[in-house]
From Swiss-Prot:
Record-given protein name: Sesquipedalian-2
Other remarks in the entry: Was named after 'sesquipedalian', an unnecessarily long description of a simple thing.
Motif, F&H: chain positions: 223-235
Intrachain S-S bonds: none
Coiled coil: 124-149
Gene name in the database record: PHETA2
Xref: SUPFAM superfamilies: PH domain-like
Highest taxon in the source lineage: Eukaryota
Length: 259
C-alpha cells in the first residue's frame, strides 16, 4: 500500500475529530524501537477512522508511525513487563510483525481494544448489513400492523341494514348510518323524478343551512321526529312556493284562451 506522506501527516494533525486518544506503551513497530530496559516506549496514540497514529508527545507535530487497521485482529496479550495491561494487533498477512501495546489500566485496555476492533471497514460493513436487516424486519412488522389495523377498522365500519323507520331518499338527500360519532351521515343524492327543475333549485331553510356547512344532524337532533320536523319545513316551503307560482300563472293562461 502506497500513501502520500504529506497527506497522511496533514490528516493526522488536522482538526478532524479523533475516535480515540491516549498514552500507550509500545514494543516494536515502525518508528518505535524497543528501549534498552525492555519497558517499552510511551507514546501518544490517535485513532482516526481505520488509521492509528503515534506521536512522541501530545504536542508532537510529526507522527512517528502509522498502522492501517485492515485485515487484522485485536486481542489481549502478555506484556514483557509485569503489571502492564497489554494487547496486540495481529495481521493475517504473512511476515508482518504484530504490534504490542499496553495501557495504564484495565479500563483503558478495554476501551482501546473495543475502539481498535471496530475501526476497520470490514466491521463497518457488518454493522451496515445488520442495520439493513433490522430495518427490513421493522418495515415488514409495520406493514403487517397497518394491514391488521385496516382490517379491524374495515370490519367495524361495515354498512348495516337500514332500520324500519329509515326514510331512504328524501328531499335529494339520503340518510345512512356510518361509524362516525354522529351516528348519521348525510349523502347528496340526485334530483328525484317528477320534480321540476325550478322546484328542485329552490333553496329552503334546511338546504341553505346544509350549503353553509350547518347540518341538523347532531347528537341533540339525531332522533327521527326532529329530523322529520326539520325536513318538513323545507317541504312546506316548496309546496307554498309551488302554489304561489301556480296562482300567478293562471291569469296568463286565461288571457291566452280568449279569442
Amino acid at each position: 500500500m502506497k500513501l502520500n506522506e504529506r497527506s497522511v501527516a496533514h490528516y493526522a494533525l488536522s482538526d478532524s475529530p479523533a475516535d480515540h486518544t491516549g498514552f500507550l506503551r509500545t514494543w516494536g513497530g515502525a518508528g518505535t524501537p524497543p528501549t534498552p530496559s525492555g519497558a517499552g516506549r510511551k507514546c501518544w496514540f490517535v485513532l482516526k477512522g481505520n488509521l492509528l497514529f503515534s506521536f512522541e508527545s501530545r504536542e508532537g507535530r510529526a507522527p512517528l508511525s502509522l498502522v492501517v487497521l485492515e485485515g487484522c485482529t485485536v486481542e489481549l496479550a502478555e506484556a514483557p513487563v509485569p503489571e502492564e495491561f497489554a494487547f496486540a494487533i495481529r495481521f493475517d498477512a504473512p511476515g508482518v510483525r504484530p504490534h504490542l501495546l499496553a495501557a495504564d489500566g484495565p479500563a483503558a485496555q478495554e476501551a482501546w481494544v473495543k475502539a481498535l476492533s471496530r475501526a476497520s471497514f470490514g466491521y463497518m460493513r457488518l454493522v451496515v448489513r445488520e442495520l439493513e436487516s433490522q430495518l427490513r424486519e421493522a418495515r415488514h412488522s409495520l406493514d403487517l400492523h397497518r394491514r391488521s389495523s385496516w382490517k379491524a377498522v374495515s370490519s367495524r365500519c361495515k354498512p348495516q341494514a337500514p332500520d324500519r323507520w329509515s326514510p331512504g331518499l328524501e328531499n335529494g338527500h339520503s340518510l345512512s348510518r356510518d361509524c362516525s360519532p354522529m351516528g348519521l351521515v348525510e349523502e347528496g343524492g340526485s334530483r328525484p323524478a317528477g320534480r321540476g327543475l325550478a322546484e328542485w333549485e329552490l333553496q329552503g331553510p334546511a338546504s341553505l343551512l346544509l350549503g353553509r356547512g350547518q347540518s341538523p344532524v347532531s347528537p341533540e337532533t339525531s332522533c327521527f321526529s326532529t329530523l322529520h320536523e326539520w325536513y318538513g319545513r323545507e317541504i312546506m316551503e316548496l309546496r307554498r312556493a309551488w302554489l304561489q307560482r301556480a296562482q300567478e300563472n293562471q291569469p296568463e293562461c286565461k288571457d291566452q284562451d280568449r279569442p
